[in-house]
Amino acid sequence: MALSTRIQAACLLLLLLASLSSGAYLRQQTRQTTALQPWHGAESKTDDSALLMLKRRKRDTNFPICLFCCKCCKNSSCGLCCIT
């Protein structure tokens, strides 16, 4: 029983050490990545503006801008009304 408790304690200690070392390694990698990419902040600003453009409402297609051709212009095959 004492041997299994020691093994469990050793495994727990190894897990704690591994999690601490991986956390420190990830923080170091994050700092290096940030230092290598100073333009990242500008890129995120353009991404934000692109998201705003996507969120804009589109024109309601039930109300067309142009009407069908009423033959008001010389080009009768245009299909659109040039008055509107």
From Swiss-Prot:
Disulfide partners: C66-C82, C69-C72, C70-C78, C73-C81
Signal peptide segment: 1-23
GO molecular function: copper ion binding; hormone activity; transporter regulator activity
Keyword Acetylation: no
Swiss-Prot/TrEMBL keywords: Antibiotic, Antimicrobial, Cleavage on pair of basic residues, Disulfide bond, Hormone, Secreted, Signal
Gene Ontology CC annotation, any one: extracellular region
Location(s), subcellular: Secreted
GO biological-process terms attached to the record: acute-phase response; antimicrobial humoral immune response mediated by antimicrobial peptide; cell surface receptor signaling pathway via JAK-STAT; cellular response to bile acid; cellular response to interleukin-6; cellular response to lipopolysaccharide; cellular response to tumor necrosis factor; cellular response to X-ray
Propeptide: 24-54
Free-text function comment from the UniProt entry: Liver-produced hormone that constitutes the main circulating regulator of iron absorption and distribution across tissues. Acts by promoting endocytosis and degradation of ferroportin/SLC40A1, leading to the retention of iron in iron-exporting cells and decreased flow of iron into plasma. Controls the major flows of iron into plasma: absorption of dietary iron in the intestine, recycling of iron by macrophages, which phagocytose old erythrocytes and other cells, and mobilization of stored iron from hepatocytes.
Family: Belongs to the hepcidin family.
Subunit structure: Interacts with SLC40A1; this interaction promotes SLC40A1 rapid ubiquitination.
PANTHER family: HEPCIDIN
Identification of the protein by name: Hepcidin
Species this protein is from: Rattus norvegicus
